[in-house]
Amino acid sequence: MSAEQNIETVKAIYEAFGRGDVDAILERCTDDVDWAADAAIEVAPWHGVKHGKAELPSFFAGIEQTGPVTEFTPLSFTGNADGDVMVFLRYAFTVTATGKDVKTNLHHYFRFRDGKVAYYRGSEDTALIASALSA
């Protein structure tokens, strides 16, 4: 698949995330998808590698249980000759348990196989997240 087609797949994943439609996200992933936030320290419920479609819903459940997402804005999409997609995003949420607001930048990297996401890594400010999660 071309980078342009893969970018459209990522956009569809983001739209599904905005609707809370995890099944639509899973449809766009390989059965053995390797999905994780690259976290220096695993403090958030979505941290840790999720292996396969059976584990992936826990990533999104972790985000949901933390608190409402108040901004999820992809700012740029880039694809390479291998069809990989990189995205720069603006992200904000409120931690329900602490009432703290988080505003940060995210970087997402997607690798594809046969038109589906086979590998995902997202980078985030883990120190900022850890601070927001602590009382």
Where are these regions (language model features)?
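Short, flexible micro-motifs
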Residues: R19, D23, H51, E55, ...
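Short amphipathic alpha-helical segments, especially helix-boundary/capping motifs
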Residues: G18-R19, D32-D38, G83-M86, K103-L106
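Hydrophobic pocket/interface hotspot
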Residues: V10-I13, I25-L26, V33, G52, ...
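Short, mixed-charge, low-aromatic patches
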Residues: K11-G20, V43-H47, I63-G67, F88-R90
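A beta-strand edge to alpha-helix "cap/lid" segment located at domain peripheries
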Residues: M1-Q5, A61-A135
